[in-house]
């Protein structure tokens, strides 16, 4: 139960998830599935059917109930890939985020290798096109340390794309891409996801989104994320209960983050862009040697002022 609403199954395409508070309730639902499969001559694949036992934090499990589907035994797992996201019995996002980070690094290397001869601006566009999906990230705990490791890998990729020093200031790295820093982007996606749930045509999803805004629901992972975003970025928590506030909240968030991002000398940043274009061969400047260009780039990227 979530509040007073019982949610016992979810479905996406041919993927079905059953949720039950007791073993007996699970057996009842599995029987319904088996009877349906028999009636309509379909089969559930036992090799792709797994069981996960979620327990109260810190409490050991003494007994694992036995379940069957279509006469086949269902195995237990501690984690499982579901629609591209790893679900863990400990209700932790760590494995999912680390897995996404590892996949991201592989994608980045492929893009930078395949498009190595293109200029930095074009490679940045391709990097976002091929590597920035982050499907399922709206469900992550935004306070997990592993997210910072993911963001660090993304900043490293941008530094490689623009061929700037490894200690280039983070705000300059983000400004070069003319996008929000990755962490801010993940927060922005969570905001849009929340309002998307509020206006969903599915009444279950709408009810869940509204429940997250009450005191009890705010202790859930998504509720904690919304409270964290409000605290971190000075947003009104009550605004997340009103669908009419969507544009206002996202506009304020993005404007606030861009103002913080460009808190450096923009004239020096424009010089940096020109030097990087010269380095890429897009611009030509006869009176500066390659060493001069590198020196200017290094000075602007790492200057403390």
Regions from the language model: what does each represent?
Residues 1-6, 119:
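Short helix/loop segment immediately N-terminal to the Walker
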Residues 2-4, 69, 82:
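Structural motif
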Residues 7-39, 56-58, 88-93:
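Catalytic palm subdomain of template-directed nucleic-acid polymerases
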Residues 8-11, 75-79:
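Short, flexible turn/loop "capping" segments at secondary-structure junctions
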Residues 13-14, 45-50, 54-57, 81-208:
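Non-catalytic, peripheral interaction segments enriched in hydrophobic/basic residues
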Residues 36-43, 164:
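Secondary-structure transition/capping motifs at alpha-helix termini
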Residues 43-78:
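Short, conserved micro-motifs composed of acidic
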Residues 47, 137, 141-142, 196-305:
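Charged boundary/loop elements
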